[in-house]
């Protein structure tokens, strides 16, 4: 289920890694710890954010009101450190979900944690409600978040309706 999304991501990233490192990319990425895989996949799919992507910098970090980052001066190293810090923060936020915490952290990095956890104005997601009830069959709830600029990705809409 959820592994299908992860597998598709890993295959794309694997191809990129194999070209860069001159080795079998799939084998290379599977040798990485899960957190490192999440970092690689996030970098690959987020891409680099320049000034035109404000308030996002680096590999998709959203600048908070008290932060002073500039896309113009940010290095790849600084962005990598920031991405890892963000993912660790989200992993801690979802710690209660055990082995699903990294999956939820990467999703929260993309859609925001309150789209999952809820807030005063946003209800708690069905995905979180199912996990809290002990139901790990969350594939359809997970891919429901696969959209860009409010529109479902064409390759995902078929899976979501079937």
Question: Model regions: which residues?
Answer:
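Early exported N-terminus immediately downstream of N-terminal targeting peptides
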Residues: 54-56, 61
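Hydrophobic membrane-insertion alpha-helices, especially the h-region
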Residues: 1-11
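Surface-exposed patches in mature extracellular/periplasmic domains of secreted proteins
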Residues: 50-53, 94-103, 141
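Long, amphipathic alpha-helical surface segments
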Residues: 12-49, 61-68, 74-93, 115-158, ...
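Short N-proximal segments of mature Sec-exported proteins
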Residues: 102-115
């Amino acid at each position: 289920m959820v592994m299908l999304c992860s597998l598709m991501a890993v295959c794309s990233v694997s191809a990129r890694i194999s070209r860069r490192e001159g080795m079998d990319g799939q084998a290379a990425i599977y040798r990485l710890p899960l957190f490192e895989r999440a970092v690689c996949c996030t970098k690959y799919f987020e891409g680099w954010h320049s000034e035109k992507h404000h308030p996002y910098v680096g590999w998709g970090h959203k600048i908070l009101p008290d932060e002073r980052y500039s896309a113009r001066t940010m290095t790849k190293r600084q962005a990598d450190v920031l991405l890892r810090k963000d993912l660790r923060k989200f992993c801690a936020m979802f710690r209660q979900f055990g082995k699903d915490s990294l999956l939820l952290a990467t999703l929260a990095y993309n859609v925001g944690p309150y789209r999952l956890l809820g807030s005063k104005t946003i209800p708690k997601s069905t995905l979180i409600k199912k996990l809290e009830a002990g139901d790990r069959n969350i594939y359809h709830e997970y891919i429901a978040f696969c959209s860009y600029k409010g529109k479902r990705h064409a390759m995902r809409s078929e899976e979501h309706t079937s």
